[in-house]
Amino acid sequence: MSDERLETLQEIGTAFARTRPPEPDTPMPAQPTLSDIFNLRLNTPKFGLPIAAAGHCTQSAAAALAAGMDEETVLACLLHDIGLAVARPDHGWWGAQLVEPYVSEKVSWAIRYHQALRYYADESVGYAYPQMYVKMFGEDYQPPEYIAAAHEHARQHKWYMRARNITLFDDYSFEKNPTWSVEPFTDIIGRHFRQPKAGLGNDASPTAHMWRTLIDPSKPL
C-alpha cells in the first residue's frame, strides 16, 4: 500500500471516528426497556426540533386516557411520534416499523397512517386542519401523492379511527417544556408492548438495528 493511499484511509478513518464527544446521552441499562427509551433518549429534542418527543407523546397519551380511550389507542398515542427519534421525514412509517415486532397490528397501523391523516380535516369527528401546518407549509399546500394515497387507503380501512384518534389527541400547541412522565402508562405498556428479555436493540427482531441507532446515534458505523 502506498503512503498516499494509507494517508487517505487514515483521513477517512478519522472522519468516521468519534472526533468529538457524543451527544450528552445518559448511558442506557444493559437491557433497555421502552420506559428507558422515553426517559433517557426521547427526553431531548432531535434533528433540530424545538421539543422532545417524550413530552409531546405523553401529553397525547394522557389526553387519550382522560377521554376514556381503549388501552391500545392510548399506547398508539404514546408511541405515535417515536419515529422522530430516528428520522424526521416519514416519521409515521419509521415509527410504525420500529415498534411493529412489539405491538399489535392495530397499534402499528395507527402509528403508520396518522402521518397522512394529519394533513386532512375530518369535520365528522371534530378534526380540523392544524394551523401549525398552515404556518409550516403555507395556505395552498398540497401533500405529495403518496400521502394522498395513504390517506385515501386509511379512510376506507376498518381501522380508520385508530389512526384518526391519534390526530384527535395530538397536542398541536407543542409545549416547549412540559411536565411529563411515562409512569402513568407503565401498566398499559406492560400489557400491550412485548418487551424483549434481552432488551430493545439486543434481541433478534427485524428492527433491533433501529433501536440500537436510537440508543447510540453517534456510533461511527
Put a short name on every predicted segment:
Residues M1-L78, I82-L221:
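Metal-dependent phosphohydrolase cores
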